[in-house]
């Protein structure tokens, strides 16, 4: 299954004891019409202890947020276990398998990319990005972590997404930023 992620960028970073995630607000119908400018694609879950962001179909993402939050509750906030269980259910369920979205989930200790093909990937460097502007944000974020160590995780996240928005036509500058201290 090939996933084409359009109309969004989600970026997450763990840096100097902080965890930050941000997403842009653009929702695009097809490749030509911007339907919404201020969508909120990053959320806090589990009493503010977990951040989650999605790229892909909005309806599919709401389904996945709900399923993921249920898994978090079932496993008492264990992010790793909830992520693995969601990926397994997503991959094996005939209806869920058709959902076209990807998630980044994180707490203070871990972050994962979770997909419908069963992947649960924890990055080596504490940085993840998904969506149409993901590669641009990832590149900018890695450079900032390496060479601007005076920046906070929140500043890195916002700056990386701003760079992506300058390059990717499916990413705008209406940024939602959430931070775990």
Curated annotation (Swiss-Prot):
Q: How is its activity regulated?
A: Allosterically activated by HslU binding.
Q: What InterPro entries does the annotation carry? A: ATP-dep_Prtase_HsIV_su, Ntn_hydrolases_N, Proteasome_sua/b, Proteasome_suB-type
What UniProt keywords are attached to this protein's entry?
Allosteric enzyme, Cytoplasm, Hydrolase, Metal-binding, Protease, Sodium, Threonine protease
Catalytic activity, EC:
3.4.25.2
Provide the protein's localization.
Cytoplasm
Record GO biological process: proteolysis involved in protein catabolic process
Would you tell me the Gene Ontology cellular component terms? HslUV protease complex; proteasome core complex
- Does the record carry Cytoplasm as a key word? yes
Q: Which CDD domains match?
A: protease_HslV
Listed GO MF terms = metal ion binding; threonine-type endopeptidase activity
Gene3D superfamilies assigned: Glutamine Phosphoribosylpyrophosphate, subunit 1, domain 1
Q: What is catalysed by this protein?
A: ATP-dependent cleavage of peptide bonds with broad specificity
The record ties this protein, via SUPFAM superfamilies, to: N-terminal nucleophile aminohydrolases (Ntn hydrolases)
Query: Where are the catalytic residues?
Result: 8
Query: Which positions does UniProt annotate for Na(+) binding?
Result: 165, 168, 171
Q: Which Pfam families match?
A: Proteasome
Q: Which family does it belong to?
A: Belongs to the peptidase T1B family. HslV subfamily.
Quaternary structure and partners = A double ring-shaped homohexamer of HslV is capped on each side by a ring-shaped HslU homohexamer. The assembly of the HslU/HslV complex is dependent on binding of ATP.
Relate the protein's function as given in its record: Protease subunit of a proteasome-like degradation complex believed to be a general protein degrading machinery.
The record's section on NCBIfam families has: ATP_dep_HslV, PRK05456.1
> What name is this protein filed under?
ATP-dependent protease subunit HslV
Q: Say which species the protein is native to.
A: Oceanobacillus iheyensis (strain DSM 14371 / CIP 107618 / JCM 11309 / KCTC 3954 / HTE831)
Taxonomy of origin reads:
Bacteria, Bacillati, Bacillota, Bacilli, Bacillales
